[in-house]
Structures are given as C-alpha cells and as structure tokens.
From Swiss-Prot:
Biological role: Cell wall formation.
Source organism per UniProt: Acidovorax ebreus (strain TPSY) (Diaphorobacter sp. (strain TPSY))
Record protein name field: UDP-N-acetylmuramate--L-alanine ligase
GO cellular-component term (any): cytoplasm
Keyword ATP-binding: yes
Molecular function terms, GO-annotated: ATP binding; UDP-N-acetylmuramate-L-alanine ligase activity
Domain of life from the UniProt record: Bacteria
Pfam families xrefs: Mur_ligase, Mur_ligase_C, Mur_ligase_M
Annotated pathway: Cell wall biogenesis; peptidoglycan biosynthesis
InterPro entries membership: Mur-like_cat_sf, Mur_ligase_C, Mur_ligase_C_dom_sf, Mur_ligase_cen, Mur_ligase_N, MurCDEF_pg_biosynth, UDP-N-AcMur_Ala_ligase_MurC
Length: 477
C-alpha cells in the first residue's frame, strides 16, 4: 500500500468552492498548500492559518504534495496539474475531495440554481445555535463565523452541492435540499432542460433509503420531478399544498416576518418567525432550514433565535452603510453576488421591500458571455425594473467574447426597451468614481455581479472617506 496522504495542494485555492475545503483539511491536521492567479483576502486569511499559498501557478509549487485538488475552473494545461500528472501524483476534482470529507460526518447537501449559499449558511447557523457544532463548507463568507468553512465536533457536515458542472452527483448526503431548478449552466447538460432536471433526480437518489429530500414546490421544475423521487420528501414553499408553508409574509425594514405552518408528517405548532434577511426569496430559504430543523428535532427556540439573529453572508445583500452623497444627504450602498436574472429580480424586489419609495440604482457587471447570450431578454427585463442602471462590460470568466452578447449590446437593448436609460462604463475600474459622483440623497445603490465588480463597493467607501477627509482639511484651513 502506498504511503498515506499527508500533504494536499490546491490549484485555485482562492476560489469560493476550494478555500473552505482547504481550511477544513488544514484543521484536520493535513499539510495544505495552494496557489491562485491573484492575491486576495481569502489567500491572506489562509496564510494567517498556516496554509502556504502562492500567487501564480508553477510546477515548483506542488513540491512534496501527495495529492493535488483542482476545480473545473482550472485548465488541463495548468503547469501544476501537468507536473502532478507527470509525477504520478493523484489529481482530485474538488467535488471528490468534498465527498471524502462528507464520509466523516452525516452530510446535509444544499442544491439548487439559486439560494444555495444563504440556505447552507442558515442551516449551519441553526445547527450551531442548537449546540450541534456542525462542520460546514459554504461558497460565501458566513459573517458570524468570519469564514466560509469550519471543522465542528458534531455529527453533521453542511455543504453546497454544485450542479454547474454536474459534480453534485459525486456527493453522498443523508439529507438533501433542492431550492429550485433553473436554466443556468446549460452547457453542462447539452442545453437540454430535461437532462438538468434528471440530474437533480439522480442527485437525490444518491441518498440512502433512509435519507430525506426537502424540496421547494413553488418552483415548477422541482414540482415536475416530485413523481420521480423515490426517497421520503418534505415539501416547502408558499403554495397551499406545501408541508412546511409560510403565510402572512411581510417586509419590516430589512427583515421578513411570517408565520410557518408545519404539516410534514406530524402537526407541529405554528411558528411566528422573524428573519433577519430581506426578500421573499429568503423566506423560501428559511423554510428549507425550518424543514431541516424539524427532521433533526432542533428545538424551536434555538431555530427562532438563529433566524432572528442571522448576520448574513458576504456579498449577499451586504450593506456597506449609509454614505455621504455629493449633493448632501446620504445614500445606501448594498452589494450582492446575484448574476442570473432570477436572482437579480429577487434581490431587486427585496430592495424595494426594504427601502420603499427610494430611488433604486443598479450597478451591474454581467458574468460570462454565454449566460448573457442565453438570458439576454430576461436581463433586459430585470434591468429595466431599476430606476437607474450603470452597466459595464461582461466578466468573461475564461470565455471568449460572443457577438451581440457583450455589455454594450445589453445597454443598447435596454435603451431600445425604453424603461430606463443605462449608463455604460467601459472599464469596471471607473465604476467607483461614477457611483460616488452620481449617487443622490436617498438613493439605494445596488452593486451586483459575480466578477470583478465585487471590489467596487469597498472602493466607493474608500473614495468617499478620502473625499470627506479632504473636505475636513479644507474647512480647517
């Protein structure tokens, strides 16, 4: 038998799906190293934990590694991958490494086109509040923990299940949530929506016979697969036939208040829920968590405390505060990772509910040319629901440009639709200045996208702070 695996190297360790696995393995006692194309707060955090990280890729970085972990974003000709194959070092896809982690615990996997990160974070928070000390691996930073991964001492591990590359079919959970099924990442499924739905059925059938599927039946595609699911099911949603159902839903500032009726096999008392998140889509995410909690016999008081005290996830409706507007007064700056029209519509609706009557300014960077092409008309519709739009070029994410699927084409189509006059900004680096200069008193500015626009809100804050310092110096003279 070959020597035991001791040193694991991650190619692309800064990725949201990679850094969490790396951190958990480090905490399990493995020697962990990794590389990424650019420096980032994620790399610096891993370094502070004792993980050796490198900026850039080179064959020398895998020295001493017993296994090399890659994500689907890493190309086959990456020098570290080539070196590993040449030296007969196992090259392990990220999803398979996550599967190995799940063997150590009872796995709860959260799948779906939208809402995975928030739902996974809520489940981890509820289990933590109940004293179950879960291990979790999340695709975003759980604010209360200051990280997107943690090695707990309890019997459960909570993970996101990624359908984008089909890798969720490697996982072996004992409980699985499907928040929704939507036409995204269709290239993985040959642009066949039926194949995508069947993949979710296959994912659910990866569970043992005693596993439980928790499904949102408000989503038509999820409802479609119900007859095909052979394991026990708990349904949730706003629909009348949902076993875990929310009624009397209302927005109260940036919170949602609602009543939950639980009829999943037994009749439990109704719950009066305060959720410290905005938007009806987050009510659905919370219902999934409430269904999980019922299956695990989590006490209601712990469940309600966790939902009311939830401090959110990085880049998911993340407030950067009320900032000074150039013409006097203040505007609210919010950041969100949403980059699909369905996600954007939900987030814009949440902003309208949380800040009624205020002008909503959307700063958006499309993500991937293929998604822009496939969802072009839906993007035009959802962008048109904002009061003002700042639009920049598509974040390619490694794709080649596609004719008529770029940022300018989207801006032209939005202009022709006539609902809003977009401002096109060639370079996303210029967006912070445009936001700082153009935001008015009372505006809600929402920066959305999964690409480099993620750095814009912090730069807006820095810019306005510098402007304020200069103004103070001018007044002092």
């Amino acid at each position: 038998m070959k020597q035991a695996i001791r040193h694991i190297h991650f190619v692309g360790i800064g990725g949201s799906g990679m850094c969490g696995i790396a951190e958990v393995l480090h905490n399990l006692g493995y020697v962990v190293s990794g590389s990424d194309l650019a420096d980032s707060p994620t790399l610096r955090r891993l370094q502070s934990l004792g993980v050796a990280t490198h900026v850039g890729h080179a064959a020398a970085h895998i020295a001493g590694a017993d296994a090399v972990v890659t994500s689907t974003a890493v190309q086959a000709d990456n020098p570290e991958v080539l070196a590993a194959r040449e030296r007969k070092i196992p090259v392990v896809p990220r999803a398979l490494m996550l599967t190995e982690l799940m063997r150590l615990r009872k796995g709860i996997a959260i799948a779906g086109a939208h809402g995975k990160t928030t739902t996974t974070s809520l489940v981890a928070s509820v289990l933590g509040e109940a004293g179950l000390d879960p291990t979790f691996v999340i695709g975003g930073r759980l604010n209360s923990a200051g990280t997107n991964a943690k090695l707990g001492q309890g019997e459960y591990i909570v993970v996101e299940a990624d359908e984008s590359d089909g890798s969720f079919l490697n996982l072996l959970p004992v409980m699985a949530v499907v928040t929704n099924i939507d036409a995204d990442h269709m290239e993985t499924y040959g642009h066949d929506f039926g194949r995508l739905k069947q993949a979710f059925v296959d994912f659910l059938h990866r569970m043992p016979f005693y596993g439980t599927a928790i499904l949102c039946i408000d989503n038509p595609a999820v409802r479609d697969i119900l007859p095909l699911v052979t394991c026990p099911v708990t349904s949730y949603g706003l629909s009348e036939d949902a076993e875990v159902r929310a009624v009397d839903v209302r927005a109260v500032g940036t919170q949602m208040h609602f009543t939950v009726q639980r009829r999943n096999g037994v009749t439990l008392p109704d719950l009066q829920v305060v959720l410290n998140l905005a938007g009806e889509h987050n009510v659905l995410n919370a219902l999934a968590v409430i269904a999980v909690a019922a299956e695990l016999n989590v006490p209601d008081d712990a469940l309600l405390r966790a939902l009311a005290g939830f401090t959110g996830v990085g880049r998911r409706f993340q407030r950067h505060g009320d900032l000074p507007a150039q013409g006097g007064g203040h505007f609210t700056l919010i950041e969100d990772y949403g980059h699909h029209p369905v996600e954007m519509a939900a987030t814009l609706a949440a902003a309208r509910g949380a800040y009624p009557g205020r002008r909503l300014v959307l700063a958006f960077q499309p993500h991937r040319y293929s998604r822009t092409r496939d969802c072009f008309e839906d993007f035009v519709k959802v962008l048109g629901t904002a009061d003002a739009v700042l639009l920049t070029e598509v974040y390619a994410a490694g794709e080649a440009p596609i004719v008529a699927a770029d940022g300018r084409s989207l801006a032209r189509a939005l202009r022709v639709a006539g609902t809003v006059e977009p401002v096109f900004i060639d370079n996303v680096a210029d967006m912070p200045q445009r936001i700082a200069a153009g935001a008015r008193d009372g505006d809600v500015v929402l920066c959305m996208g999964a690409g480099s626009i993620g750095g814009v809100p912090a730069k807006v804050v820095d810019l306005l702070q510098k402007n304020e310092l200069l103004a103070q110096e001018g007044r002092a003279q």
